Amino acid sequence: DVERSRGLGDVYKRQIYFGANLFVATVLVIFIGVLKIINSDLMKPTFNDLLDDWENPMTTTHLNYMMNPVIMVFDKLFDKLFPWLDKYDFDAAKLNEKIGFWGSRFAIGIYLGIFIGLISHQDIKSITTLAFMAATCLELFSIIGSWFIAAVEPLSQGVADFANKRLGGRMLNIGLDWPFLAGRAEIWAAANVLAPIMLLEALVLPGNGILPLGGIIAMGVTPALLVVTRGKIIRMIVIGAIELPLFLWAGTLSAPFITHTARALHASGIPATGLISSSTKEGPIEQFIAVLVGKASKGEMMMILYAALALIAYTALFFWYRHEMMKRNQKYSDEGKEVADDVKFVATHAAANSAD
């Protein structure tokens, strides 16, 4: 498990790796990029709600959140089949407090280091070194990300103010990386619970070839769960456990490409044998589609059919999700919150005219 080959660039390169020409790869990446931008606007009111700040300019086009449509399917099933579970939901901050150090990122890194050291038959000194290295890395992942977000937030606000002033009152959002939501305790509570679940799934899941390390704190998974469920921790954990196999399979599929690229670039620390990958790299669905499109580009009819069906299903699911998010945003607007007209059903000026 290696952190981290990222985003649309990775989708682009993987298509070419699996046979797509430059034009086909570019078209698919542009298509996914457009959906990401649409999604960033759809999520903006939910971000405002989660941050309890309806004037903040921040949103994100991060590929993490393209899992939202899949998560929303399960969220709607919860609404229909298990609505009573929400009565037993609990406060994520209190859960983190109860788990304490033994469920922290540092402790999880120690567990993983010891486990990997034992199964690789290393001596006590090597196991101890590995445990503390893994613990330190896991602890630093989120801290360094939060530093970056804090550093660019004033710049983002300044850019937004400047652009809004020059565009005659048109409001623009500023896209940041996902950690501007990292202050929500639900992200870390769900990640702490999902970590041992992911390790267990990795050991028993058919077709999986990854043992999670850096990705064990499921930062490619929990932010989207937070947005769709709006912090319902039981839903986040259950849906997260259901969708984790997608990430493990996608990481296994990506391993030859990532290892080939790392060796071609003469990256340090790449083993002569075996493969490296990431267990929770964002965009698993997009990875599968990229591989199908890449293989379809070679002209095989069956792969062309599979790629076409996958793209149709992917697009249909996204626009169903868009409809559901617009319903959510309309409720925010009906409650008096400021919501852009293009992400809800009833435009503000139209509602005002009908009231007159």
Over which residues does each language-model region extend?
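Membrane-embedded hairpin module used as a gating/binding unit in multi-pass transport
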Residues: 66-169
